[in-house]
Amino acid sequence: FSYAVDAPLDMRMDPREGATAADLLADLSERDLADLFSRYGEERYSRQIARAICRRRTKQPYERSADLVDTIRHAIPTPAQFGSGHPAKRVFQALRIAVNDELTMVEEGLEAALRILKPGGRLAVISFHSLEDRIVKEFMRDCAAPCVCPPDLPICGCGRAATMRVITSRVVRPGAAELDRNPRAASSRLRVAERTDAPLGDDA
């Protein structure tokens, strides 16, 4: 998982199943790699990195994290290597998310939480990057929407009621005291919503 320590390019949460990061680097096309780094890592230099990976893998497959870090360092402009954070951070994040299908897991976890919450129960979610936070934000917003009919309809025809009420009008970020105690919380974002007494779609 780490770009700071040389290790096998696996990244699977469950080593018994699924493709490894090395498999993705070997099998995905240059375009698919660039899309992956851009979508899941929000990597500015996704195309350059994907091109460099494909060029290098024709000579030798990627097996170790140090090899990938070296490729990334040589693929991006020199000033970007000394910006905030490690230059390989976003690519490693993208690979980890893809290998473990993490965003799907977030979506499924939110749906499961909604099903088991009783009226008045609260769902508090801490995410650590913008992709997760976006999913949480949209999920809570959609659950809090009382009607999904087109705005030009004169009356509501869907009969939908809001199943959640958003408690945090804005995302909650850690304060200075929290960061002093726990510097790793710097990227965390908290959102909270409360279950209403409206039935879910399957129960209506």
Spans of features found by a protein language model:
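S-adenosyl-L-methionine-dependent methyltransferase catalytic core, i.e., the SAM/SAH-binding region
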Residues: F1-A204
